[in-house]
């Protein structure tokens, strides 16, 4: 039919002819619009996921608040007070006038010294604690800390040795959550065993213990220390590189560690039976000095940025996999809608947009079911149960919609392949982009091959 005949036709007939002529383009546009609309239920599922994550985080917080939170161990640090002469300017009233005068006064300051050598050896015994359906990893850690301080020197501050208050020296250790300490804490320093009491003596850190030390003097060459502690915590353990040279060894039966922080282990062994890790760190990788005065507070951000240690990851974080799978939801919808559209093109079957909508909603419900099932079962089991239910629903519906059991069987096989393809992508975290791209090229090649002989203009004009 040429353009002259179209122009001579009545308006109503003309509209029908145009709709018929561009029916394929219109159908493709409707499918594209429907795909975009299905992003709405997918976003709603994503919103439900965020809500469940918030509930999980709240449950984990309740567990850790009673057992022990993520622990960071910093110290010990030696604190020695001293007296010095300080000149300041102060406003004084003289003869009813305010004058600014120089005042010389004796003030008290504290000097902080970090150890020259710091060693830590520990073992973490992990287990899972539940709050309802939610679980978090907690551990009981046995740590042995040792090392030595160099002889404290006040020369850089020009302090008179006679003004150093050696008899008021203190030793301080920062432990993030002291609720995790399961027994009394003691430290052996300079040959004497002292008990540690709660009190935060270090700036820029949270929580800590300290003790008064007697017997220190300016004639000591080196001050050794050693202590053992049993510490409850959850999910992670960190150390601060407080020594000039730091040597830390950790072992555990947890099979899925994640080594985090400013320094990675110099050596590690990870297997299904657990892990062993060994750090050798110098003080060059941190931003705070080896000694300072209390009028130069340590930067808390700088301290945290140089910490190192290990996270005890859950063996399988189902929420993480569900979140990744939802990101592929639009791909799943496009692939299945492409298959339905090809059935329309290659056969006389016509599929109504409402039927496309029902199939799309079924695909979206798969992700909601996956989220619900993954909270009570492993992700793999939840995925394939959800995939089986979704495939069964869509297949039975397709048999009627496509008016053929054979075509419904093709849809079933296609869905199984698509779900298997997405599952492989989810499991292959490092190579998911490569495998996913290769799969899309394969799908595009199949579509191009199947439609290679279609004369689209002739089909619309038929």
Where do the protein language model's features map onto the residues?
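Hydrophobic alpha-helical transmembrane signal-anchor segments
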Residues: 20-47
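Glycine- and acidic
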Residues: 42-46, 315-326, 424, 428
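Generic detector of multi-pass transmembrane helix bundles and their immediately adjacent loops
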Residues: 330-462
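Soluble non-transmembrane domains of integral membrane proteins
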Residues: 54, 58, 65, 79, ...
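Cytosolic-side membrane-insertion boundary helix
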Residues: 23, 302-333, 352-353
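N-terminal Lys/Arg-rich, disordered targeting/topogenic segments
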Residues: 1-20
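Short extracytoplasmic
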Residues: 61-89
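Alpha-helical transmembrane signal-anchor/signal-peptide segments
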Residues: 44-70
